[in-house]
């Protein structure tokens, strides 16, 4: 019984007496096996029936007995039938599913290779060097491990595990009020608007040491755990009683003060400013008189006046003495200030090209103290030196170049440090900056009125010039085209 098989038998090529043939063939097929159906599954010229055989030999006997046999005018075709469409579809569907899985895997691999190739092409050198590709974890993290989040990274060929430190200070919650916002940080405590402690900043577990290597010596600095543990803020130390005392004292001080009444200003500073302005106006008037003086004045007279120090008005002297008493600060003073009034271009150019005629001598001193440490007994007389040199040259009979005149001005002691007025280059720059072109200041004084008055005419002129330029360019282009 273990060798019992069931087969679907195909009977075909039946064109004559189909009903009689099917009824007689059913009885004859029963001799070789057990027919599972009471009749054939009929179609146009063929039929099917399921028969159970004891072994394969019974099926072979049946096929030899009836295949290619003439039966009632029909040449029979008997053989094992092909499986029905449902079974074939099931087998083919299972086969297709397996093939689809393989094809999808191949397609994914191909698409991934193409994606990585395009991503590699789009990356810059910095991305190739610094960006490290990672992946998202597939399984969710356990609840007990949420506080100890780590990540793995490939460092120099070895896999390292690092801990993700919490850097977020505070977040946003929808059901919280404005006073619940954490905004105050005092004594390593985060506090909200109600002055409640929300979070504590504690570095006791994260003790680190810093080492500085310097050859054979090493300096190690460790972090103290109890730093700022006993210190408190001034706001924390201040009790309510002290705050009330301070408020009472401020109330007593400001009780009788009228905030609406304007305060009276001290006019001492304004008086000093008015005196300074008066002195400056007087100096400007004197400078204007000197600039507008006739050109044929005696030059020696101007030299003598320039060498002598200018006398200050009495008011300015008193003011300078008062300033010296208030502020003991040394301020270098010069003999002559640059005038801010009217400027004469002729006088400026004359001073520029003849600087030696009226060059002011500076009274600038680098050190205010007297030169007590200088031995003036050993000073060399310049006239005596010139006479000795001339006598020696006469005795030798040599003709030498004249000795340059050495300045004996006592004020020029600090040869390394000299004021602006004694520098030939800077004086020239200053004089050139005073030269002004005539009429430049009044050129654009009434520019708005002139623009709105001539706007239409100027626009028409510009358009006409533009048209002429375009015509001229077209003519040139047409001529060049004809030549080609």
From Swiss-Prot:
Organism encoding this protein: Saccharomyces cerevisiae (strain ATCC 204508 / S288c)
Disordered as annotated region, ranges: 260-330
Chief location bin: nucleus
GO terms of molecular function: ribonuclease inhibitor activity; RNA binding
Note: Present with 2170 molecules/cell in log phase SD medium.
Function: Required for 60S ribosomal subunit synthesis. May be involved in assembly reactions occurring within late pre-ribosomal particles.
Name used for this protein in its record: 60S ribosome subunit biogenesis protein NOP8
PTM-bearing positions, type Phosphoserine: 234, 239, 268, 370
Location of this chain's protein in the cell: Nucleus, Nucleolus
CDD domains linked to this entry: RRM_NOL8
């Amino acid at each position: 019984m273990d060798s019992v098989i069931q087969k679907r038998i195909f009977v075909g090529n039946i064109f004559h007496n189909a009903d009689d043939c099917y009824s007689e063939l059913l009885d004859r097929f029963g001799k070789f096996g057990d027919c599972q159906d009471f009749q054939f599954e009929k179609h146009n010229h063929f039929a099917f029936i399921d028969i159970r055989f004891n072994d394969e030999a019974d099926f072979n006997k049946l096929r030899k007995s009836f295949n290619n046999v003439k039966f009632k005018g029909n040449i029979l075709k008997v053989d094992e039938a092909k499986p029905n469409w449902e079974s074939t579809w099931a087998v083919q569907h299972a086969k297709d599913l397996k093939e689809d899985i393989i094809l999808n895997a191949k397609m994914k691999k191909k698409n991934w290779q193409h994606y990585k190739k395009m991503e590699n092409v789009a990356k810059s050198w910095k991305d190739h060097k610094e960006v490290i590709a990672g992946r998202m974890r597939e399984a969710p993290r356990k609840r007990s491990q949420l506080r100890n989040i780590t990540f793995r990274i490939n460092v120099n060929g070895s896999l390292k595990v690092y801990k993700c430190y919490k850097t977020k200070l505070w977040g946003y919650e929808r059901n919280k009020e404005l006073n619940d916002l954490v905004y105050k940080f005092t004594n390593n405590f985060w506090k909200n608007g109600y002055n409640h402690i929300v979070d504590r900043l504690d570095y006791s577990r994260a003790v680190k040491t810093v080492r500085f290597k310097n050859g054979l010596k090493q300096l190690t600095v460790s972090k103290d755990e109890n730093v700022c543990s006993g210190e408190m803020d001034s706001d924390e130390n201040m009790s309510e009683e002290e705050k009330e005392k301070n408020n009472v004292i401020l109330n007593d001080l400001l009780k009788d003060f009228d905030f609406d009444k304007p305060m009276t200003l001290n006019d001492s500073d304004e008086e000093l400013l008015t005196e300074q302005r008066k002195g400056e106006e007087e100096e400007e008037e004197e400078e204007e008189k000197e600039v507008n003086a006739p050109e044929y004045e005696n030059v020696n007279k101007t030299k003598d006046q320039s060498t002598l120090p200018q006398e200050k008005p009495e008011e300015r002297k008193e003011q300078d003495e008062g300033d010296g008493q208030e502020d003991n600060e040394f301020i270098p003073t010069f003999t002559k200030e640059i005038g801010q009034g009217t400027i004469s271009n002729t006088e400026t150019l004359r001073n520029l090209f003849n600087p030696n005629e009226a060059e002011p001598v500076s009274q600038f001193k680098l050190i205010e103290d007297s030169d007590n440490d200088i031995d003036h007994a050993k000073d060399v007389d310049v006239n005596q030196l010139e006479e000795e040199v001339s006598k020696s040259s006469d005795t030798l009979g040599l003709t030498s170049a004249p000795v340059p005149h050495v300045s004996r001005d006592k004020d020029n002691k600090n040869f390394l440090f000299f004021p602006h007025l004694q520098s030939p280059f800077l004086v020239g720059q200053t004089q050139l900056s005073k030269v002004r072109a005539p009429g430049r200041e009044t050129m654009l004084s009434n520019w708005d009125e002139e623009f709105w008055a001539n706007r239409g005419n100027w626009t028409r002129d510009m358009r006409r010039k533009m048209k002429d330029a375009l015509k001229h360019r077209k003519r040139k282009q047409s001529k060049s085209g004809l030549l080609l």
